[in-house]
Amino acid sequence: MTSDDTVRPGRPRSIETLAALSAEQTEAVLGLLDEAARTDGQQAVSEQGRLQLRGGEREGVSHLLLTAGGELVGYAQLEDTDLVEPPAAELVVHPGHRGHGHGRALGSALLAASGKRLRVWAHGGHSAARHLAQVLGLTLFRELRQMRRPLTDFDAPEPVLPEGVTVRTFVPGEDDAAWLAVNAAAFAHHPEQGSLTQRDLDDRKAEPWFDPAGFFLAFRGDELVGFHWTKVHAEEGLGEVYVLGVGPGAQGGGLGKSLTTIGLRHLAGQGLPTAMLYVDADNKAAVSVYERLGFTTHEVDLMYRTET
């Protein structure tokens, strides 16, 4: 959520809500996101949201295009796929068109579309986004930390795996179903991750950054019990602990820490200077583990919601 909500006179605006975007509309939205990221230093829409721009209609996802004078100046995405929580949204206004109330207009449209049950991300926690959340009557609900640590001095030894556990890399097509099942079980409490489908996995496998050599699977016999999927952000020189999960039956035995170390050793071996990861601030156990591994908080994403 990125917007300066100070209202100044501007060109007449309109908001169109669509179930899917055309190729031309997708490119226009991506251009808007890039312009905003250059100004804000961070993407206003998550990786999942950007993937959902392409590929036609997706269940529970809608796109709001705000135009002024025929020009696209704002975008919002609303996802209503969580069976428990309110719909989640992300929004952005072009840096050159802020201060005209476009953010408030998009926020009001999202509230109307969601039946006034809404969660909104503010990536980076910018002050303008916090102000807009207040104007819309939203309260802080969740804090997602991005943590980082240098890899230049990472010299952890090869980890000792729990008895009977072996690790190999992901084989696309062969391991998809098993990974989706363990991912769902490991993140049953975290619908954003645990609800990933084959289509979501295929989207990621089609991305230029996907590399199965950095996708580690832990097995006990023939049973997949955990994984560490790493991601390289080549332009930024960052290696990410992209997704780390351990099946419920294998938790508590040190497998998560071992998989973390395996992934970090891999990223360090790529010559990447820095590792990063995302973790919920209220997951005290995970934050403590990562802090012991040398990670510190780099920035935060904030989620706001309507009162329930």
Region locations from a protein language model:
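Acyl-donor-binding surface of acyltransferase catalytic domains
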Residues: M1-G10, D80-A88, H94-V165, Y304
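Short amphipathic alpha-helix that is part of the acyltransferase structural core
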Residues: M1-L51, P159-G194
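Active-site/acyl-donor-binding loops of N-acyltransferases
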Residues: T2, L136-D155, T261, A268-T308
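Conserved donor-binding loop and adjoining core beta-sheet/short helix segment
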Residues: L18-A19, A23-T26, L33-S114, R119, ...
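Hydrophobic beta-strand residues of extracellular immunoglobulin-like
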Residues: S62-L65, G214-L217, T261
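A structural microfeature
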Residues: G74, F141-E143, G226, G256, ...
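Conserved acetyl-CoA-binding loop-helix of GNAT-fold acetyltransferases
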Residues: G99-A113, V243-P248, G252-G269, V287-R292
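Phosphate-binding active sites in nucleotide-utilizing proteins
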Residues: F187-H233, P248
